[in-house]
Amino acid sequence: MKKIYIITGANGFLGNNIIRNLEQNSENEIRALVLPTGITKSLENLNCKIYYGDVTQKDTLTTIFENIKDKEVYVIHCAAAVYIKTAYNPSVYDVNVNGTKNIIDKVLETKSKLIYISSVHAITEKLNHELIT
């Protein structure tokens, strides 16, 4: 059975390197999700098809999930917003929580498998700045 890999955050450091690893097996079909405004230079000459979408906009995820019936589909969710400053940034929540929910919904809807890559913003800091273990 043909395997399809859908990589979110495909033009980021991790997503790009995952694609480089997956493309070593020429039987893999690799679908790279990139923001509509994303730079795709790092994906040039890689064995992947680029799809434009935004994990925070569920309707933009439809195309990348098309034509997957009777195929083994793995979604590797690398898309994330990282904001190092201490001030609250609502886009971090929107991408990392709402965007991940949209990906999970599509995975469940299509009976795909999910590999979730977390971010530094998955857990808030403790109030007294203790290390989280």
State what each model feature region is:
Residues 3-4, 28-31, 112-114:
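Residues at the starts of beta-strands that form the adenosine-phosphate
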Residues 10-12, 38, 80-84, 119-122:
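Active-site proximal helix/loop that lines the substrate pocket
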Residues 16-18, 42, 86-87, 125-127:
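Short glycine-/acidic-enriched loop or helix-start segments at secondary-structure transitions
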Residues 39-42, 48, 52-95, 106:
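NAD(P)H-binding glycine-rich loop region in Rossmannoid oxidoreductase-like domains
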Residues 26-38:
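Conserved glycine-rich Rossmann-like NAD(P)H-binding loop of the short-chain dehydrogenase/reductase
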Residues 74-77, 98-133:
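Conserved Rossmann-fold NAD(P)-dependent oxidoreductase catalytic core, especially the SDR/UDP-sugar
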